[in-house]
């Protein structure tokens, strides 16, 4: 008789534990336009803050998540690297140097808060380490 109560309770607990928190961060699809736009915004803002004369680009997306808040918060962990393109240049495509000594790779965490109905997007975290 007790197993009729215990088994369903375990099933519910297992389902809730594997579903993640409602409203918590979840994996973001890099093929989603909103995710790509948020990452591009983060890279542009990051480049505005660097003292380097060369543009930095994403070499690799390590992790991408999104969270429903009052809008959408995107959380990216990325490997960044230097490109041969100078800031203010006219180049449209700037790939990260293949040579690690030229690319000077480093890891960053970016958080972007997007509220499209207000035409508002903000960088809320721009933290990098060598």
UniProtKB/Swiss-Prot annotation:
Which Pfam families would you find in this protein's record?
A: Cystatin
The family database entries (InterPro entries) matched by this protein are listed as: Cystatin_dom, Cystatin_sf, Prot_inh_cystat_CS
Q: What is its main location?
A: secreted
**From the UniProt record, which GO molecular function terms apply?**
cysteine-type endopeptidase inhibitor activity; peptidase inhibitor activity
Disulfide pairings: 85-94, 108-128
Entries under SUPFAM superfamilies matching the protein: Cystatin/monellin
Q: According to the UniProt entry, where is the signal peptide?
A: 1-19
**Sites annotated Reactive site:** 23
Q: Motif Secondary area of contact residues? A: 67-71
Swiss-Prot/TrEMBL keywords? Disulfide bond, Protease inhibitor, Secreted, Signal, Thiol protease inhibitor
The cellular component terms of Gene Ontology attached to this UniProt record, alphabetical and capped at eight, are: cytoplasm; extracellular space; vesicle
Cell compartment(s), UniProt: Secreted
| PANTHER family attached to this UniProt entry | CYSTATIN, CYSTATIN C (AMYLOID ANGIOPATHY AND CEREBRAL HEMORRHAGE)-RELATED
The function of this protein is:
Cysteine proteinase inhibitor.
Protein name per its UniProtKB record? Cystatin
């Amino acid at each position: 008789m007790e197993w009729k109560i215990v088994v369903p309770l375990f099933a519910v607990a297992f389902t809730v534990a594997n579903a993640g928190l409602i409203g918590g961060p979840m994996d973001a699809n890099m093929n989603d336009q909103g995710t790509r736009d948020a990452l591009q915004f983060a890279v542009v803002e990051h480049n505005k803050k660097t003292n380097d004369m060369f543009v930095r680009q994403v070499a690799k997306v390590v992790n991408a998540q999104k969270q429903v808040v009052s809008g959408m918060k995107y959380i990216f962990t990325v490997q960044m690297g230097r490109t041969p393109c100078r800031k203010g240049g006219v180049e449209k495509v700037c790939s990260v140097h293949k040579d690690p000594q030229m690319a000077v790779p480093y890891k960053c965490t970016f958080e972007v808060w997007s509220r499209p109905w207000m035409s508002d997007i903000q960088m809320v975290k721009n933290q990098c380490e060598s």
